Design a protein with these regions (language model features):
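ATP-dependent carboxylate activation and anion-phosphoryl transfer catalytic cores
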Residues: 1-192
Length: 192
């Protein structure tokens, strides 16, 4: 997932319209709290399709909360909690969306185990801030569970999902990498 400004503007507007329409409909039918929607964009035609709806947080939720809470807003989870606390609150959604329209570039990569076999993990990298030097070598700078501490494009946060003694299997999420900047260029190929 690359989260960046200026990309796919027409498609982004279509996603916003679809999400707003569905959210309004769910609210009218009594649904309260946060939910996540995944959209698929055909980058050849510009068509936008609804991929799935999750009545919970999803793999993209951390990125969404990173953007909303870092750039002068409240985490979306805060609004979720307000709904379930029966708090009396109001928000101007257009102002919130306007504030969140400009932000830094962030990327998230979910690392999956691709092989069709089950194996015990003997050793796994630690969660924390990792840094790449000029030679392309990476090292753990500090253990952490907070990706807000990523300070530049030479650093990334790695969240370890499984550790030594756990089992890996085909499709298992092995870890999540969050970095500043984009991991793909406009041609959808990985950056250096």
């Amino acid at each position: 997932n690359d989260v960046f400004t200026g990309g796919m503007e027409k498609e982004r507007k279509a996603v916003l319209r679809m999400a707003q329409k569905l959210g309004d409909k769910l609210y009218a039918h009594g649904y309260r709290g946060a939910f996540c929607m995944d959209f698929l964009i055909d980058t050849d035609t510009g068509e936008v399709y609804l991929g799935e709806i999750n009545p919970r947080v999803s793999g993209a939720s951390p990125m969404t909360n990173l953007i909303t809470s870092t750039y002068g807003g409240c985490p979306i989870y805060f609004f979720h909690l307000l709904e379930f606390m029966d708090a009396d609150w109001e928000v101007d959604l257009s102002q919130v969306q306007k504030r969140w329209a400009e932000f830094d570039n962030w990327s998230q990569l979910i690392l999956k185990y691709p092989h069709d076999k089950t194996e015990m993990i003997t050793k796994a990298p630690a969660s924390g801030i990792w840094q790449m030097d000029d030679k392309g070598e990476i090292r753990l700078v500090r253990k952490s569970i907070d990706w807000f501490l990523v300070s530049g494009e030479s650093e990334a946060f790695y969240l370890r999902v499984y550790t030594g003694g756990d089992y890996r299997y085909k499709g298992a999420d092995m870890g999540i990498l969050v970095s500043r900047g984009r991991m793909q260029n406009d041609n959808r190929t990985l950056t250096e």
